[in-house]
A protein has these predicted regions:
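Amphipathic alpha-helical polymerization modules
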Residues: 1-140, 213-218
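Polar, low-complexity export/assembly segments characteristic of proteins
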Residues: 16, 23, 27-30, 34, ...
Length: 218
């Protein structure tokens, strides 16, 4: 077979192109530190690498979720501790009332109790990362409305979102879930319906406040 100069040139160019591609591949491996930079380099290895990258991405997401949940739970514990402490302080104030108390002393106790009820409402409206932790799935607005009577300073707590019966709307009672591992979801919140015992706590605070108001009336 006769080899023409044209054939030789084409063969030469193919060899040069092949060598350049090989050099470019090696250069990419050196600069990126990766043996496989695209699927065509090594399809089998490329698939394995993509699978590993997906697993790494999932693990990073799970770790981020766990960190978020831990912060949320810490904030929940702090808020509930505050509610518990304030409730105990209200009980102490009430048990300190003596039959010999005059109106001024009763007004002082009433003022302290109402201030603590207000602080309990603020604790129920605790937020973490811009989300209200006791709001169920309604995380963008406080779950509790703190009403203060302008005349006598009496404080009452009510659900911000209620139905016709005065009960919290479904969103306030929702649970929040997050994925912490493959196939494992974790419910990480307490909603206001749970922590207020379906609003019974609000009723008790209101009864206490009203009773003190009656004892301090002129």
């Amino acid at each position: 077979m006769r080899v023409t100069s044209n054939n030789m040139m084409n063969s030469y160019l193919k060899d040069v192109q092949k060598n350049l591609q090989g050099m470019n591949k090696i250069n990419n491996q050196i600069s990126t530190g990766n043996q496989v930079n695209k699927v065509s380099d090594d399809p089998l290895k490329a698939v394995k690498i993509m699978n590993l990258n997906n697993e790494i991405s999932d693990i990073e997401r799970y770790n981020s979720n766990v960190d978020e949940v831990n912060g949320w739970l810490d904030m929940t514990d702090n808020a509930l501790d505050k509610v518990g402490t304030l409730s105990s302080e209200i009980k102490t104030l009430l048990t300190s009332i003596s039959g010999t108390f005059g109106k001024d002393e009763m007004k002082a106790v009433s003022s302290e109790v109402n201030e603590k009820i207000k602080q309990i409402g603020e604790a129920f409206n605790t937020s973490y990362g811009g989300k209200y932790i006791f709001g169920g799935s309604i995380t963008d607005e406080p779950p509790v409305k703190v009403n203060v009577d302008e005349n006598d300073g009496t404080v009452s707590l009510v659900f911000r979102n209620t139905n016709d019966e005065g009960k919290p709307n479904k969103g306030l009672s929702d649970n929040l879930n997050v994925s912490v591992s493959n196939g494992i979801n974790f419910n990480y919140n307490l909603n206001i319906n749970e922590v207020s015992n379906s609003g019974d706590a609000f009723d008790i605070f209101e009864e206490v406040s009203d009773a003190l108001k009656g004892d301090t009336a002129d």
